[in-house]
């Protein structure tokens, strides 16, 4: 992968996430972005909530820019936590689960963002995409 997320890699991540969404029976919106948060691949499954399109891409963008999962960022952005209020910066960040960085040799090369199910379902589908890339190395 050479510390860069190719279209082929992004499709591999997307396909694994789509398979997981089918397995759990929840139509999803799934976005894969590069390390700058720019869209590489996207899919909206039949029946996925239309309002979740922006949320999926926002989760992926947030995770890539901040270099951590949106779930972890959410914990750090809770009231009284060190990053409280960060979600209003950078054009708006998403601070609940479903966005996870994609790494190559420890370097963040992009991220996946998933939305349309429960937060737990979104995280599970995103993790399937991450695992597919990790298994490719």
For the regions a language model picked out, list residue spans one by one.
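Flexible, solvent-exposed loop/hinge segments and secondary-structure transition points
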Residues: 1-137
């Amino acid at each position: 992968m050479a510390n860069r997320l190719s279209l082929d890699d992004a499709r591999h991540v997307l396909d694994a996430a789509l398979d997981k969404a089918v397995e759990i029976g929840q139509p999803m919106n799934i976005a894969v972005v590069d390390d700058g948060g720019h869209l590489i691949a996207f899919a909206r499954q039949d029946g996925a909530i239309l309002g979740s399109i922006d949320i999926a891409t926002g989760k992926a963008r947030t995770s890539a820019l901040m270099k951590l999962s949106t779930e972890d960022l959410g914990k750090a952005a809770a009231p009284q936590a060190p990053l409280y209020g960060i979600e209003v910066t950078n054009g708006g960040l998403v601070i609940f689960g479903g966005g996870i960085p994609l790494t190559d040799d420890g370097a963040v090369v992009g991220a996946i963002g998933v939305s349309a199910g429960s937060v737990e379902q979104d995280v599970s589908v995103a993790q399937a995409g991450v695992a597919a890339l990790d298994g490719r190395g």
